[in-house]
């Protein structure tokens, strides 16, 4: 088992002079070590690499998604675990390293998690207002249910979670400098 998974993760960030190459990022570190051993590239600055580099990651993720689907269809829980580990390895590990995002991935992940959690409602009143707004907006009947100390609004016909009126989109742009954005978008 990875040593960094056994400790609380607290990497250095913008104010640190240490290169992201040396940050401890669970899952990414193991792939970095593998790539170093195999002579494969690791990027440490945000980049859109050559097409063959990102296509390798894309194709590998798609292959593993297919293996996941096949394992589920067969009822093969070991195959499911294998596919999920491979998906994580390729997407979080290789994807992060091929795009030079090691120094950004953890804070970005936390931002996405906070955004996802904002889909729930803190109060009954917020849930009731969310039901009203989402029902009008989407023209679908909605209802809410209390789950623990939160309220979740669902579309009634299929139980799809509807976003709270206080939902916020993750702001991932905040993790890039203007220069990094210019260099990677061509603008």
Where on the chain are the PLM-derived regions?
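Flexible "arm" and connector segments at domain edges
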Residues: 2-187
């Amino acid at each position: 088992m990875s040593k960094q998974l056994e400790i609380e993760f607290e990497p250095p960030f913008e104010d640190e002079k240490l290169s992201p190459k040396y940050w401890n990022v669970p899952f990414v570190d193991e792939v970095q070590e593998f790539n170093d051993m195999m002579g494969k590239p690791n990027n440490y600055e945000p980049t859109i690499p050559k097409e063959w580099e990102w296509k390798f990651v894309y194709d590998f993720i798609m292959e593993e998604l297919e293996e996941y689907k096949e394992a589920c269809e067969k009822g093969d829980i070991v195959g499911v675990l294998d596919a999920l580990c491979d998906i994580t390895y390729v997407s979080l590990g290789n994807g992060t390293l091929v795009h030079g995002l090691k120094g950004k991935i953890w804070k970005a992940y936390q931002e996405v998690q906070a955004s996802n959690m904002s889909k729930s409602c803190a109060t009954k009143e917020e849930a009731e207002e969310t039901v009203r707004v989402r029902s009008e907006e989407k023209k679908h009947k909605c209802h809410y249910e209390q789950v623990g100390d939160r309220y979740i609004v669902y579309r009634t016909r299929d139980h799809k979670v509807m976003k709270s009126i206080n939902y916020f989109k993750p702001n991932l742009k905040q993790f890039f400098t203007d220069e990094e954005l210019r260099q990677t978008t061509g603008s």
